[in-house]
């Protein structure tokens, strides 16, 4: 009994290491948002041009997730993680010493490549190393690490960047990643590739209607969210008439809400997965509908943003878990496709929001996002009703 408890502790600590890894990956993905002005000043560029770094990052992840995962499908997972972190650290060193913007883009491309593989394998890997009967909780802890990147990583990165320069922020991210690498080397056992899938998996996955339904649902939902979220700061300042500091606080509220969402997911998802998923997107859609209506009411807008953040974070977790459940025999391929599709949603939502601002006005980003949210609900319900009676080995529900 004592030995079993010790094993459980070691396994759970391994999950914590993966949560730290998720934290550092999400921090480096979003921290440029807080450093754009400083980066632009150092290279004597307009902020709008510097911002292309974020777009390029997202599209590299989107394009490379599946090909990179397939190329690494047979590699032992511990060795693969070590290799990813070495490239991740080297890319941050290059970022810190980048002598021009083009070199910084190359460095960020290296980080994006590691991102595309890391998120393709991490969810399934975390579940494999978790203690028995703690699989859902392990995924929730992984999500907690991601959420803390918004709560702690983003503001700390901004504070450090303002005090010591943006290069110091990237340097410290690299140092933190090096500490995680040491823990991976010391704590993770050899983890053979398992159910990773291959090119042969693609036709098999394509014949799973609920998986395809979920992928399309993901594009719609994430586009709905990022149609509004991409421009939440100017919306708060120009439409909500709040100060710049309060607008920044909104981003922190989103991070805190992710922590709450991970707790709710751990406790509620396994009870009724489909209801949990649909309830989350329904709440998200309602929040987007109400965004403009409460924008001028300080307390109400903060409460709404918190609810919105809980909904999208819970929804992201539910979709990721559902992908794993629908493709247990090709988890890495299915997750790689999901990661790429998720980033398509990010880019698509930002583009839609941009067009809404130009043609309908900033005030309407919530309404357009809500339309996409409503379409996603209708799509999922219709497809679920259509395919819910398909044999289990095809639908894999």
UniProtKB/Swiss-Prot annotation:
Keywords: Cell inner membrane, Cell membrane, Membrane, Sugar transport, Transmembrane, Transmembrane helix, Transport. It holds the Pfam family MFS_1. The chain crosses the membrane at residues 15-35, 51-71, 80-100, 103-123, 137-157, 169-189, 209-229, 246-266, 277-297, 299-319, 333-353, 365-385. This is Probable sugar efflux transporter. GO terms for cellular component: plasma membrane. GO terms for molecular function: carbohydrate transmembrane transporter activity. NCBIfam families: PRK03545.1. It is found in: Cell inner membrane. The gene is sotB. Belongs to the major facilitator superfamily. SotB (TC 2.A.1.2) family. It comes from the Bacteria. It is a multi-pass membrane protein. Involved in the efflux of sugars. The physiological role may be the reduction of the intracellular concentration of toxic sugars or sugar metabolites.
